């Protein structure tokens, strides 16, 4: 090894060690000036000898060249969100659900930690070196932010020690400490630049900079809170012990994290953090409680979007008084008329709030609110602003009643309210400009047709200029036409056309979701596609056939039937197909028609030890069974595993056949 290479190795090792002491252990052993001198020497040597550059060099923290866009990263293990509890009763219900499922939870410890208000990220270490970082995104797919994350000094580019797995995914929160946020905004104010609203927005904006040099200048921090992929090694079977392992490898862990042994201690931890919240160095909006035993976590499993073994116990929403100046009525994609309160701006829950939803006419009546009232505004869960009450003693003499419109405020069509529904709707359909805009925004959204470059502002201009009326009109646009729009040059216009052409190759679930059928989300669209296999079959299905689809009840089935019964909707579909929208054909898995389960409606409940729930479902469907998520009088068989709960009780009450896991295995042979 040459003298230069040896010196580079020494410098990197020394800077790594001092970085851990400073950012992880909070116990620096050299002055900042000495650290800076070593870093300058490293930068100079690497600049003079680029052939000796290393992917884990501390110098990478200063940032690289700007990116054109972020690449997508598919998470090998989904990054799910957490369910919330807002009071002790909901926390106790969470605990009871777990103990009803698995009694051993009663004897488990719980790992408790503050719920940081930042941005969730995934860090992938291969042979101890940070090779990729990604945002959480939608939980399934995030964005590659490796270059930006390398600039965060608290995140090690190389793990310490030698006992870590060969592939280790560390998950945690990138956030901006309060002091760093205040200093950042002070600099922005001095320069006459726009200030950030809160530390979370500042952290998110900093992390998603295409130029990592900008990120490097931002005071970002990181705390690890879990792991994802583990290959080529093993971790402790305790969540808390895994934290200690991560800390030993150089990853920072929230110092407030605590292991407790009872629900009472969980509540005490929550109250302690709540009382000290304002004195912490970072913003939090609650605490996270996790079952500590990893094996119990695995047995408890997950629901669709969250683990059963963890919950976020949110702090009480912060409330403030403000004036209700006016009420505007907005029209949504499905024609829903929503009253929006226009408020005297007030700072609450970390943001300035000037609007709040009043939901519907029933809510206005319940509150007894009038324009001119002083109202109590709350950010429910510290997220959604809402009016919770009226201060009647402050009502002025000139307060005005809120009159719900009988005609659409946009197109003047009649406003209708279906009996039994709280929502009033414009009857104008796509002749209503507001519905048209929202329908088109939905159509091009990421989970739908995923057309890049067609943002809300562009859609609004296209509708206002009467350039598009239906989704099919989008595919008739030409680049030359788009250049008349604001901020749309020839290159941007061509990019939009290219994106539209690319979007023509889609999937049946995405196409169904893009149509904007009431209460048909992306998961329901996927179930419909997998059940019927073709658009034609869906268009011709009856109410009874729709109800056979997993998670489709009478209400959703009625919406589907009504949608496909309308000639104008069929015309929109035909026009889209004429524009060249296609998708790969779907084929059904082979079904054993002579199976004893063929045509039977089956429900799985409880946890199974010999196969996963998904494997059992797939095997049953291959035998011709229809697997649904709830027990009803139409259910033929229930297979009950360990800790089966309410579904088993209902099946017994209805006299439905119930079999255990061993019987399920026999059926599948």
UniProtKB/Swiss-Prot annotation:
EC number: 6.5.1.2
Assigned keywords, A-Z: DNA damage, DNA repair, DNA replication, Ligase, Magnesium, Manganese, Metal-binding, NAD, Zinc
Domain BRCT: 592-669
Named cofactor requirement(s): Mg(2+); Mn(2+)
Reaction(s) catalysed by this chain's protein: NAD(+) + (deoxyribonucleotide)n-3'-hydroxyl + 5'-phospho-(deoxyribonucleotide)m = (deoxyribonucleotide)n+m + AMP + beta-nicotinamide D-nucleotide
Enzyme class: ligase
Stated role: DNA ligase that catalyzes the formation of phosphodiester linkages between 5'-phosphoryl and 3'-hydroxyl groups in double-stranded DNA using NAD as a coenzyme and as the energy source for the reaction. It is essential for DNA replication and repair of damaged DNA.
HAMAP family (alphabetical): DNA_ligase_A (MF_01588)
Family: Belongs to the NAD-dependent DNA ligase family. LigA subfamily.
Descriptive protein name: DNA ligase
Gene name of this polypeptide: ligA
